[in-house]
UniProtKB/Swiss-Prot annotation:
GO terms for molecular function: calcium ion binding. Residues 1-154 are annotated as: Disordered. This is Probable calcium-binding protein CML49. It comes from the Eukaryota. It comes from Arabidopsis thaliana. SMART domains: EFh (SM00054).
Amino acid sequence: MSGYPPSSQGYGYGGNPPPPQPPYGSTGNNPPPYGSSGSNPPPPYGSSASSPYAVPYGAQPAPYGAPPSAPYASLPGDHNKPHKEKPHGASYGSPSPGGYGAHPSSGPSDYGGYGGAPQQSGHGGGYGGAPQQSGHGGGYGAPPPQASYGSPFASLVPSAFPPGTDPNIVACFQAADRDNSGFIDDKELQGALSSYNQSFSIRTVHLLMYLFTNSNVRKIGPKEFTSLFFSLQNWRSIFERFDKDRSGRIDTNELRDALMSLGFSVSPVILDLLVSKFDKSGGRNRAIEYDNFIECCLTVKGLTEKFKEKDTALSGSAIFNYENFMLTVLPFLVA
Protein backbone atom coordinates (compact mmCIF):
# COMPACT_ATOMS: atom_id res chain seq x y z
CA MET A 1 0.00 0.00 0.00
CA SER A 2 1.32 3.40 -0.90
CA GLY A 3 1.15 6.32 1.43
CA TYR A 4 -1.02 8.29 -0.94
CA PRO A 5 -4.81 8.44 -0.77
CA PRO A 6 -6.59 6.33 -3.35
CA SER A 7 -7.29 7.90 -6.71
CA SER A 8 -10.81 9.27 -7.23
CA GLN A 9 -10.75 8.38 -10.92
CA GLY A 10 -10.69 4.60 -10.64
CA TYR A 11 -11.16 1.55 -8.53
CA GLY A 12 -7.78 -0.14 -8.81
CA TYR A 13 -6.78 -3.23 -6.97
CA GLY A 14 -7.13 -2.55 -3.27
CA GLY A 15 -8.94 0.72 -3.87
CA ASN A 16 -12.09 1.94 -2.21
CA PRO A 17 -15.38 0.26 -3.22
CA PRO A 18 -17.42 1.85 -6.01
CA PRO A 19 -19.75 4.72 -5.12
CA PRO A 20 -23.43 4.07 -4.47
CA GLN A 21 -25.76 3.33 -7.40
CA PRO A 22 -27.16 6.39 -9.23
CA PRO A 23 -30.70 7.46 -8.38
CA TYR A 24 -33.59 5.35 -9.71
CA GLY A 25 -34.38 6.11 -13.32
CA SER A 26 -30.97 7.64 -14.21
CA THR A 27 -28.26 6.05 -16.36
CA GLY A 28 -25.06 7.13 -14.66
CA ASN A 29 -23.78 10.57 -15.58
CA ASN A 30 -26.00 10.80 -18.65
CA PRO A 31 -29.58 12.04 -18.27
CA PRO A 32 -32.30 9.57 -19.26
CA PRO A 33 -33.68 9.98 -22.76
CA TYR A 34 -36.84 12.06 -23.03
CA GLY A 35 -39.90 9.93 -22.60
CA SER A 36 -38.08 6.85 -21.24
CA SER A 37 -39.68 4.86 -18.43
CA GLY A 38 -36.78 2.85 -17.01
CA SER A 39 -36.72 -0.82 -17.79
CA ASN A 40 -40.47 -1.14 -18.31
CA PRO A 41 -41.46 -1.29 -21.99
CA PRO A 42 -43.83 1.42 -23.26
CA PRO A 43 -47.54 0.52 -23.22
CA PRO A 44 -49.02 -0.60 -26.54
CA TYR A 45 -50.70 1.95 -28.78
CA GLY A 46 -54.21 2.62 -27.56
CA SER A 47 -53.66 1.09 -24.11
CA SER A 48 -55.66 2.76 -21.37
CA ALA A 49 -54.22 0.75 -18.47
CA SER A 50 -51.20 2.98 -17.84
CA SER A 51 -52.19 6.20 -19.57
CA PRO A 52 -55.31 7.91 -18.18
CA TYR A 53 -55.49 10.24 -21.16
CA ALA A 54 -55.17 7.65 -23.91
CA VAL A 55 -58.23 7.08 -26.06
CA PRO A 56 -58.53 3.40 -27.06
CA TYR A 57 -58.25 2.76 -30.75
CA GLY A 58 -61.73 2.30 -32.17
CA ALA A 59 -63.49 4.27 -29.43
CA GLN A 60 -66.72 6.00 -30.41
CA PRO A 61 -66.22 9.54 -31.80
CA ALA A 62 -67.62 12.63 -30.12
CA PRO A 63 -70.83 14.10 -31.60
CA TYR A 64 -70.56 17.09 -33.90
CA GLY A 65 -70.41 20.29 -31.92
CA ALA A 66 -70.03 18.59 -28.53
CA PRO A 67 -67.06 18.96 -26.15
CA PRO A 68 -64.15 16.75 -27.24
CA SER A 69 -64.73 14.05 -24.63
CA ALA A 70 -68.53 13.95 -24.56
CA PRO A 71 -69.53 10.30 -24.88
CA TYR A 72 -71.44 9.61 -28.10
CA ALA A 73 -72.93 6.15 -27.54
CA SER A 74 -70.24 5.46 -24.94
CA LEU A 75 -68.91 1.97 -24.65
CA PRO A 76 -70.09 -0.08 -21.63
CA GLY A 77 -68.26 0.89 -18.46
CA ASP A 78 -67.17 4.28 -19.79
CA HIS A 79 -68.28 6.75 -17.13
CA ASN A 80 -65.70 9.50 -17.62
CA LYS A 81 -67.02 12.99 -17.09
CA PRO A 82 -66.94 15.34 -20.08
CA HIS A 83 -63.95 17.63 -20.31
CA LYS A 84 -65.24 21.11 -19.49
CA GLU A 85 -62.40 23.17 -20.93
CA LYS A 86 -62.58 24.42 -24.49
CA PRO A 87 -59.75 23.45 -26.86
CA HIS A 88 -56.95 25.94 -27.18
CA GLY A 89 -57.91 28.65 -29.64
CA ALA A 90 -61.47 27.39 -30.23
CA SER A 91 -64.30 29.90 -30.23
CA TYR A 92 -67.44 29.41 -28.18
CA GLY A 93 -69.76 26.87 -29.81
CA SER A 94 -67.24 25.75 -32.41
CA PRO A 95 -67.05 22.06 -33.35
CA SER A 96 -64.56 19.82 -31.66
CA PRO A 97 -61.13 19.62 -33.32
CA GLY A 98 -60.95 17.25 -36.25
CA GLY A 99 -64.64 17.46 -37.16
CA TYR A 100 -67.34 14.83 -36.71
CA GLY A 101 -66.01 11.32 -37.00
CA ALA A 102 -62.42 12.08 -35.91
CA HIS A 103 -60.85 10.52 -32.82
CA PRO A 104 -61.81 12.56 -29.74
CA SER A 105 -59.07 14.40 -27.90
CA SER A 106 -58.84 14.60 -24.14
CA GLY A 107 -56.64 15.79 -21.32
CA PRO A 108 -53.20 17.33 -21.79
CA SER A 109 -52.78 15.78 -25.24
CA ASP A 110 -54.96 18.62 -26.61
CA TYR A 111 -52.03 20.94 -26.02
CA GLY A 112 -49.17 18.73 -27.09
CA GLY A 113 -48.14 17.82 -23.52
CA TYR A 114 -45.95 14.96 -22.48
CA GLY A 115 -47.13 11.77 -24.14
CA GLY A 116 -49.61 13.66 -26.32
CA ALA A 117 -49.94 13.46 -30.06
CA PRO A 118 -48.06 16.13 -32.04
CA GLN A 119 -50.42 18.84 -33.18
CA GLN A 120 -50.51 20.89 -36.32
CA SER A 121 -51.66 24.45 -36.55
CA GLY A 122 -54.18 25.44 -39.15
CA HIS A 123 -55.94 22.90 -41.31
CA GLY A 124 -54.95 19.31 -42.02
CA GLY A 125 -54.68 16.19 -39.95
CA GLY A 126 -51.64 14.66 -38.31
CA TYR A 127 -49.32 12.17 -39.88
CA GLY A 128 -51.34 9.25 -41.19
CA GLY A 129 -54.66 10.97 -40.49
CA ALA A 130 -57.36 12.14 -42.84
CA PRO A 131 -57.37 15.85 -43.80
CA GLN A 132 -59.34 17.94 -41.35
CA GLN A 133 -61.49 20.98 -41.98
CA SER A 134 -61.12 22.82 -38.71
CA GLY A 135 -59.26 22.81 -35.41
CA HIS A 136 -55.83 21.32 -34.80
CA GLY A 137 -56.11 18.22 -36.98
CA GLY A 138 -55.93 14.54 -36.14
CA GLY A 139 -53.26 12.96 -33.96
CA TYR A 140 -50.22 11.02 -35.02
CA GLY A 141 -51.35 7.83 -36.67
CA ALA A 142 -55.04 8.63 -36.16
CA PRO A 143 -57.19 6.38 -38.35
CA PRO A 144 -58.93 8.24 -41.17
CA PRO A 145 -62.68 7.92 -41.67
CA GLN A 146 -63.76 4.54 -42.94
CA ALA A 147 -64.99 5.85 -46.26
CA SER A 148 -61.47 6.96 -47.21
CA TYR A 149 -60.41 3.36 -47.67
CA GLY A 150 -62.86 2.80 -50.52
CA SER A 151 -66.50 2.18 -51.21
CA PRO A 152 -68.29 -0.46 -49.14
CA PHE A 153 -70.26 -1.55 -52.21
CA ALA A 154 -69.22 -4.59 -54.19
CA SER A 155 -67.77 -4.27 -57.67
CA LEU A 156 -70.03 -5.42 -60.47
CA VAL A 157 -68.27 -8.22 -62.36
CA PRO A 158 -69.39 -10.07 -65.50
CA SER A 159 -71.32 -13.26 -64.85
CA ALA A 160 -73.03 -16.07 -66.74
CA PHE A 161 -76.31 -17.91 -66.43
CA PRO A 162 -76.10 -20.87 -64.03
CA PRO A 163 -76.24 -24.28 -65.73
CA GLY A 164 -79.79 -25.42 -66.41
CA THR A 165 -81.32 -21.93 -66.33
CA ASP A 166 -84.83 -21.78 -67.76
CA PRO A 167 -84.50 -20.77 -71.46
CA ASN A 168 -87.35 -18.29 -70.99
CA ILE A 169 -85.27 -16.41 -68.40
CA VAL A 170 -82.27 -16.39 -70.76
CA ALA A 171 -84.42 -15.10 -73.61
CA CYS A 172 -85.94 -12.41 -71.38
CA PHE A 173 -82.51 -11.15 -70.34
CA GLN A 174 -81.10 -11.22 -73.88
CA ALA A 175 -84.09 -9.29 -75.20
CA ALA A 176 -83.48 -6.57 -72.61
CA ASP A 177 -79.70 -6.50 -73.21
CA ARG A 178 -79.95 -4.63 -76.51
CA ASP A 179 -76.27 -3.69 -76.70
CA ASN A 180 -75.07 -7.23 -75.84
CA SER A 181 -72.95 -5.85 -73.01
CA GLY A 182 -73.79 -8.69 -70.63
CA PHE A 183 -75.59 -6.25 -68.31
CA ILE A 184 -78.98 -4.58 -68.25
CA ASP A 185 -79.66 -1.25 -66.58
CA ASP A 186 -82.59 -0.19 -64.41
CA LYS A 187 -84.88 0.84 -67.27
CA GLU A 188 -84.16 -2.37 -69.16
CA LEU A 189 -84.82 -4.46 -66.05
CA GLN A 190 -88.09 -2.64 -65.47
CA GLY A 191 -89.17 -3.46 -69.04
CA ALA A 192 -88.04 -7.09 -68.78
CA LEU A 193 -90.08 -7.66 -65.62
CA SER A 194 -93.11 -5.93 -67.14
CA SER A 195 -93.06 -8.46 -69.99
CA TYR A 196 -93.74 -11.13 -67.35
CA ASN A 197 -96.63 -9.19 -65.81
CA GLN A 198 -94.42 -7.93 -62.99
CA SER A 199 -94.83 -4.16 -63.12
CA PHE A 200 -92.72 -2.24 -60.61
CA SER A 201 -91.85 1.38 -59.94
CA ILE A 202 -88.31 2.47 -60.71
CA ARG A 203 -87.65 2.76 -56.97
CA THR A 204 -88.55 -0.91 -56.48
CA VAL A 205 -86.32 -1.81 -59.43
CA HIS A 206 -83.43 0.06 -57.80
CA LEU A 207 -83.96 -1.83 -54.55
CA LEU A 208 -84.01 -5.12 -56.44
CA MET A 209 -80.72 -4.28 -58.16
CA TYR A 210 -79.08 -3.19 -54.91
CA LEU A 211 -80.20 -6.27 -52.95
CA PHE A 212 -79.10 -8.75 -55.60
CA THR A 213 -75.79 -7.12 -56.58
CA ASN A 214 -74.78 -5.27 -53.37
CA SER A 215 -73.60 -2.58 -55.75
CA ASN A 216 -74.59 1.04 -56.24
CA VAL A 217 -74.04 0.64 -60.00
CA ARG A 218 -77.52 0.29 -61.42
CA LYS A 219 -76.78 -2.66 -63.67
CA ILE A 220 -77.32 -6.38 -63.27
CA GLY A 221 -75.80 -9.45 -64.92
CA PRO A 222 -77.22 -12.87 -65.92
CA LYS A 223 -76.45 -14.65 -62.64
CA GLU A 224 -78.03 -11.95 -60.47
CA PHE A 225 -80.98 -11.61 -62.86
CA THR A 226 -81.71 -15.33 -62.52
CA SER A 227 -81.69 -15.15 -58.70
CA LEU A 228 -83.88 -12.05 -58.79
CA PHE A 229 -86.36 -13.69 -61.15
CA PHE A 230 -86.83 -16.79 -59.00
CA SER A 231 -87.13 -14.70 -55.82
CA LEU A 232 -89.90 -12.66 -57.41
CA GLN A 233 -91.74 -15.84 -58.35
CA ASN A 234 -91.47 -17.04 -54.75
CA TRP A 235 -92.70 -13.72 -53.34
CA ARG A 236 -95.64 -13.66 -55.74
CA SER A 237 -96.72 -17.13 -54.61
CA ILE A 238 -96.44 -15.99 -50.96
CA PHE A 239 -98.51 -12.88 -51.68
CA GLU A 240 -101.22 -14.93 -53.38
CA ARG A 241 -101.24 -17.47 -50.55
CA PHE A 242 -101.81 -14.83 -47.85
CA ASP A 243 -104.21 -12.71 -49.90
CA LYS A 244 -106.99 -14.98 -48.70
CA ASP A 245 -109.89 -12.80 -49.87
CA ARG A 246 -108.31 -12.37 -53.33
CA SER A 247 -108.60 -8.60 -53.05
CA GLY A 248 -105.18 -7.95 -54.57
CA ARG A 249 -104.08 -6.50 -51.23
CA ILE A 250 -102.88 -7.92 -47.91
CA ASP A 251 -103.68 -6.29 -44.58
CA THR A 252 -101.56 -5.98 -41.45
CA ASN A 253 -102.25 -9.47 -40.13
CA GLU A 254 -101.68 -11.05 -43.53
CA LEU A 255 -98.45 -9.10 -43.90
CA ARG A 256 -97.30 -10.39 -40.52
CA ASP A 257 -97.91 -13.99 -41.61
CA ALA A 258 -96.28 -13.42 -45.00
CA LEU A 259 -93.13 -11.96 -43.46
CA MET A 260 -93.06 -14.79 -40.93
CA SER A 261 -93.09 -17.31 -43.78
CA LEU A 262 -90.04 -15.53 -45.20
CA GLY A 263 -88.26 -15.82 -41.85
CA PHE A 264 -88.80 -12.26 -40.56
CA SER A 265 -90.58 -11.80 -37.23
CA VAL A 266 -91.41 -8.12 -36.74
CA SER A 267 -93.31 -6.42 -33.93
CA PRO A 268 -96.83 -4.92 -34.29
CA VAL A 269 -95.35 -1.43 -34.13
CA ILE A 270 -93.07 -2.13 -37.10
CA LEU A 271 -95.93 -3.79 -38.98
CA ASP A 272 -98.04 -0.64 -38.59
CA LEU A 273 -95.16 1.47 -39.87
CA LEU A 274 -94.67 -0.79 -42.88
CA VAL A 275 -98.36 -0.73 -43.80
CA SER A 276 -98.48 3.06 -43.40
CA LYS A 277 -95.42 3.42 -45.61
CA PHE A 278 -96.41 1.05 -48.42
CA ASP A 279 -100.19 1.56 -48.51
CA LYS A 280 -100.90 3.41 -51.78
CA SER A 281 -104.05 4.94 -50.29
CA GLY A 282 -102.01 6.78 -47.70
CA GLY A 283 -103.17 4.56 -44.87
CA ARG A 284 -106.91 4.56 -45.58
CA ASN A 285 -107.07 0.93 -46.74
CA ARG A 286 -104.50 -0.33 -44.23
CA ALA A 287 -103.41 -2.83 -46.87
CA ILE A 288 -100.56 -3.31 -49.38
CA GLU A 289 -100.81 -4.20 -53.07
CA TYR A 290 -98.45 -6.64 -54.77
CA ASP A 291 -95.82 -4.24 -56.16
CA ASN A 292 -95.51 -2.42 -52.82
CA PHE A 293 -95.48 -5.78 -51.04
CA ILE A 294 -92.32 -6.60 -53.00
CA GLU A 295 -90.73 -3.28 -51.98
CA CYS A 296 -91.75 -3.92 -48.36
CA CYS A 297 -90.16 -7.39 -48.45
CA LEU A 298 -87.00 -5.99 -50.02
CA THR A 299 -86.69 -3.38 -47.26
CA VAL A 300 -87.24 -5.84 -44.41
CA LYS A 301 -84.99 -8.47 -46.01
CA GLY A 302 -82.19 -6.02 -46.79
CA LEU A 303 -82.11 -4.31 -43.39
CA THR A 304 -82.35 -7.65 -41.56
CA GLU A 305 -79.44 -9.12 -43.52
CA LYS A 306 -77.29 -6.03 -42.94
CA PHE A 307 -78.08 -6.19 -39.23
CA LYS A 308 -77.22 -9.90 -39.03
CA GLU A 309 -73.80 -9.17 -40.54
CA LYS A 310 -73.03 -7.29 -37.31
CA ASP A 311 -74.98 -9.62 -35.01
CA THR A 312 -72.50 -12.48 -35.39
CA ALA A 313 -73.69 -14.13 -32.16
CA LEU A 314 -77.33 -14.00 -33.33
CA SER A 315 -78.25 -12.34 -30.03
CA GLY A 316 -80.61 -9.76 -31.50
CA SER A 317 -78.14 -6.96 -30.71
CA ALA A 318 -75.41 -5.35 -32.79
CA ILE A 319 -73.03 -2.39 -32.60
CA PHE A 320 -72.80 0.05 -35.50
CA ASN A 321 -70.57 3.07 -35.80
CA TYR A 322 -71.99 6.19 -37.42
CA GLU A 323 -70.57 5.49 -40.87
CA ASN A 324 -71.82 1.90 -40.99
CA PHE A 325 -75.25 2.92 -39.78
CA MET A 326 -75.62 5.52 -42.52
CA LEU A 327 -74.37 3.09 -45.19
CA THR A 328 -76.85 0.50 -43.96
CA VAL A 329 -79.95 2.72 -43.98
CA LEU A 330 -79.38 5.26 -46.76
CA PRO A 331 -79.49 2.86 -49.75
CA PHE A 332 -83.08 2.01 -48.78
CA LEU A 333 -84.02 5.68 -48.47
CA VAL A 334 -82.46 7.01 -51.67
CA ALA A 335 -83.23 4.11 -54.03
